[in-house]
Design a protein with these regions (language model features):
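Acidic, low-complexity intrinsically disordered segments
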Residues: 1-233
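Radical SAM enzyme core and accessory elements
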Residues: 2-8, 50-60, 376-383, 387-474
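Acidic-and-aromatic substrate-binding clefts and catalytic sites of carbohydrate-active enzymes
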Residues: 12, 39-47, 246-250, 276-280, ...
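Short helix-capping segments at alpha-helix termini
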Residues: 31-32, 91-96, 141, 260-267, ...
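Conserved strand-turn element in the central/C-terminal portion of the radical SAM core barrel
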Residues: 39, 274-275, 302-311, 323-348, ...
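Non-cysteine beta-strand/loop elements that form the S-adenosyl-L-methionine
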Residues: 62-65, 126, 284-302, 364-370
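Catalytic cores of alpha/beta
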Residues: 109-115, 283, 343-358
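Radical SAM [4Fe-4S] cluster-binding motif and immediate context
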Residues: 171-334, 350, 354
Length: 474
């Protein structure tokens, strides 16, 4: 059966639709014909959609939703109205059922369905569920009983039971179904997964909702074979998209060892997200030897009390240790900070900035205001009467909801300016300092740097651009 897959993500710098590509591989392995409409490259989607659908009959349309908004407290830009317009145009040119999926969809499926009007949605792994839907459609059989689906029912929504599949059952990934080379040249990197799921208890995080709380591992040889296919296309900078690459550590070590055995470590430049807690010397060394150039640690705070409130299970001392181990192994370090959760004070912010300032990190990304996703522990906590006044947004389903501790809200940006001063390592929203912009969406400094040939994780590109400018002879 012929299936259309649509990527509606048009943010710049462009990010390759990894999930959509994996879904396409699953459909092809099951014998379906797949055509991909990548709207990232279309200046006029309203014309590209009819040109794609007219003259072709499709039995199923898949819509991949990676992000529902820009996740920025300062801008709060929702992408859902644009997705809704895309669905509306598709409907005019195809009568096939439209099924949404992707990480962004899986976090808030009912809201996305209500706004976009898609027929159904897949929560979690699309490779298996969308393929099962296509198999049923090919036989003209009902598919509404399949697991992981969200369906319209009597003016409301119904979620089918969740089912997960071991990732060793994923088909081989050719990495040729989207234009990864163009994404690399215009977006600076490619993505890959070595696992799915996150068992951590962070109060704000939606990853367990989208990917499950149980970790499922990909065989290291499959991951390295996929990396080899990217390298064969001239793609040398890769971001590992796992929630936390070093959880569990033994699998991370196996991945590094397989890269080294495959002889890819000297050609590959890769970046990852990691947890600061229990980050070991052995892993730091193996990551560097296998080509790791930078790690983004989700530190969140340097204050012990706030770490506990955020559900983090490591101490400030472990943050410092992780940075030291990376420095000693030649790995660039980024710490992501999340300020403004319930209980945040001026004092906890000061302790955080002080700790980060002496951590030796290469860059420190400061997010002020916490995105509140439905279904997280934070979403329940902020419904308390004393916390509701800290909520920002949520005027309707299209408006992203954030929380900012009311006690710090009037002064937090002034305090950050005073604490950080001119330290270039800190990235945070400052309308008077575009070089500090930590919103990657439509970041013109970043877009220009990639156009000039910079590659890698976006925080590291911004670091290198700044450092090059500072050291350039006058």
């Amino acid at each position: 059966m012929r299936v259309a897959l649509v990527n509606p993500n048009r943010i710049k710098p462009p990010i390759s639709p990894l999930g959509l590509e994996y879904v396409a591989e699953g459909l092809l392995a099951a014998g379906h014909e797949v055509n991909i409409l990548d709207l990232c490259w279309e200046e006029q989607p309203e014309k590209a959609i009819p040109a794609f659908f007219n003259g072709r009959e499709y039995g199923l349309v898949g819509l991949s939703i990676r992000n529902t908004d820009d996740c920025s407290f300062a801008t709060r830009e929702s992408f859902l109205p644009g997705f809704s317009s895309i669905v509306e145009v598709i409907r005019k040119h195809s009568g096939a059922p439209i099924v949404a999926g992707g990480v962004g969809f899986s976090v808030m499926p009912e809201a996305v369905m209500a706004i976009t009007g898609v027929d159904a949605g897949v929560v979690g792994d699309g490779e298996f569920t969308l393929t099962a839907i296509a198999d049923r459609c090919r036989r003209q059989a009902s598919w509404e009983d399949l697991p992981n689906l969200v369906l319209h029912r009597n003016g409301s929504f119904r979620r089918n039971p969740v089912s997960t599949v071991p990732l060793f059952r994923m088909p081989p990934m050719s990495r040729t179904l989207v234009d990864n080379r163009r994404y690399y040249l215009e977006g600076g990197q490619a993505g890959i997964e070595t696992k799915r799921g996150c068992p951590m208890g962070c109060v704000y995080c939606a990853d367990p909702l989208a990917k499950g709380s149980a970790i499922r591992l990909r065989p290291p040889e499959d991951v390295v074979a996929e990396l080899g296919r990217l390298l064969s296309q001239g793609i040398e900078h890769v971001h590992i998209c796992d929630s936390e690459f070093n959880v569990p550590e033994d699998h991370a070590l196996e991945i590094c060892g397989e890269i080294i055995r495959g002889g890819l470590g000297d050609r590959l430049h890769w970046f990852a997200y990691c947890k600061p807690g229990s980050f070991s010397w052995e892993l730091a060394g193996q990551m560097r030897r296998s080509g790791c150039r930078g790690i983004n640690f989700g530190a969140d705070s340097g204050d012990e009390g706030m770490l506990g409130r955020l559900g983090r299970d490591f101490a400030p001392s472990e943050i410092l240790s992780a940075a030291r181990l990376c420095r000693e192994n030649g790995i660039a370090v980024m710490f992501d900070l999340l300020l403004g959760a319930p209980g945040e004070t001026r004092e906890s912010i000061a302790r955080t900035i002080e700790l980060m300032g002496r951590s030796g990190a290469d860059r420190l990304g400061v997010t002020v205001g916490v995105r509140v996703y439905p279904g997280t522990r934070l979403s329940k906590e902020v419904q308390r009467e004393d916390l509701r006044k800290g909520l920002v947004g949520g005027s309707d389903l299209r408006d992203p909801v954030f929380f900012l501790e009311p006690g710090i809200a009037p002064t937090v940006f002034d305090q950050l300016d005073a604490l950080v001063g001119n330290d270039p390592r800190f990235l945070f929203f400052d309308p008077d300092r575009p070089d500090r912009n930590y919103n990657y969406n439509a970041n013109q400094v970043l877009v220009r740097a990639i156009r000039e040939g910079h590659r890698g994780a976006y925080w590291d590109i911004l670091r290198r651009v700044h450092d090059k400018r500072v050291t350039r002879p006058s």
